[in-house]
Amino acid sequence: MSLALLQQHSPKIIDGKAIAQSVLEEVKLEVERYKAQGIEPCLAVVLVGEDPASQVYVRNKVQKAAFVGIRSLEFRFDADLSEDELLTQIDRLNTERGVHGILVQLPLPKQINETRVLERIHPQKDVDGFHSENVGGLSQGRDVLTPCTPTGCIRLLKDSLGDDLSGLHAVVIGRSNIVGKPMAALLLKESCTVTVVHSKTRNIEQVCQQADIVVAAVGKANMINASYLKADAVVIDVGINRIMTHEKTRLVGDVDFEDALPMVSAITPVPGGVGPMTIAYLMKNTLQAVRLQHPQI
């Protein structure tokens, strides 16, 4: 049965596409409100090189910006761009008052230090939420820009469980700076009891079996099956893995979807779960950047 048919027959499947569309509609209304007050939200996207996947991601981001009414500026550079040249471009965008958000598409060519580049972006324009000031601010519970994927995951959880997540035990599988660590911090902010497991954790399966919420972000295809899950858990699958089946490539998550589905109360599919939320929350973060730069509104 196709995923579309499964979603019609199973309320357990969290429809990330539909929820992301709702987020985009919210953003669209807010953009109109800002424009009525003379502020045109603007996102600058920087792409270095010609990586095909990066080009697709940039195109999708620009299209979604156009849909919600956010002005986008694209800056494309050859793969041999020097780090100093890229930093100079970021400095220009930092000082440009009409630019509210800056996104540097990763990965960058090997001659460029990603950490130095991301740290150069002004924290209030850092729509990816990767700057150390924003990372620290999140851990302190301050109103800062947070990474798009885990922030989108919180919205998916609230759509399934309601706005109050307090007291629930959440297990985050993976400790990356992009998803795992900020996911744990955001869940703590929601007053969940949070456990982070990773490659060095003993008895991962037993730990996961205690969880009301499981967020899988480890990058291993179908690693989590029903034996890891307790009945009625809510599962958010952040993984995107390409595997070969019957001489065809298909996308799967970190969770064995078909095995887990009968066990859980709700689960995100791959594709069509977390992925659409990431770009939707990039648009949401661009508006958050506008608010931070124009606190009087």
From Swiss-Prot:
Annotated Gene3D superfamilies: Leucine Dehydrogenase, chain A, domain 1 (3.40.50.10860), NAD(P)-binding Rossmann-like Domain (3.40.50.720)
Keywords associated with the record: Amino-acid biosynthesis, Histidine biosynthesis, Hydrolase, Methionine biosynthesis, Multifunctional enzyme, NADP, One-carbon metabolism, Oxidoreductase, Purine biosynthesis
SUPFAM superfamilies reported for this sequence: Aminoacid dehydrogenase-like, N-terminal domain, NAD(P)-binding Rossmann-fold domains
Domain of life (superkingdom): Bacteria
Record-level GO BP terms: L-histidine biosynthetic process; methionine biosynthetic process; purine nucleotide biosynthetic process; tetrahydrofolate interconversion
Reactions that this protein is recorded to catalyse: (6R)-5,10-methylene-5,6,7,8-tetrahydrofolate + NADP(+) = (6R)-5,10-methenyltetrahydrofolate + NADPH; (6R)-5,10-methenyltetrahydrofolate + H2O = (6R)-10-formyltetrahydrofolate + H(+)
Keyword Hydrolase part of the UniProt annotation: yes
Amino acids binding NADP(+): 174-176, 199, 240
UniProt subunit comment: Homodimer.
Record PANTHER family: C-1-TETRAHYDROFOLATE SYNTHASE, CYTOPLASMIC, C-1-TETRAHYDROFOLATE SYNTHASE, CYTOPLASMIC-RELATED
Protein name as catalogued: Bifunctional protein FolD 1
Species of the source: Acinetobacter baylyi (strain ATCC 33305 / BD413 / ADP1)
Taxonomic lineage of the native organism: Bacteria, Pseudomonadati, Pseudomonadota, Gammaproteobacteria, Moraxellales
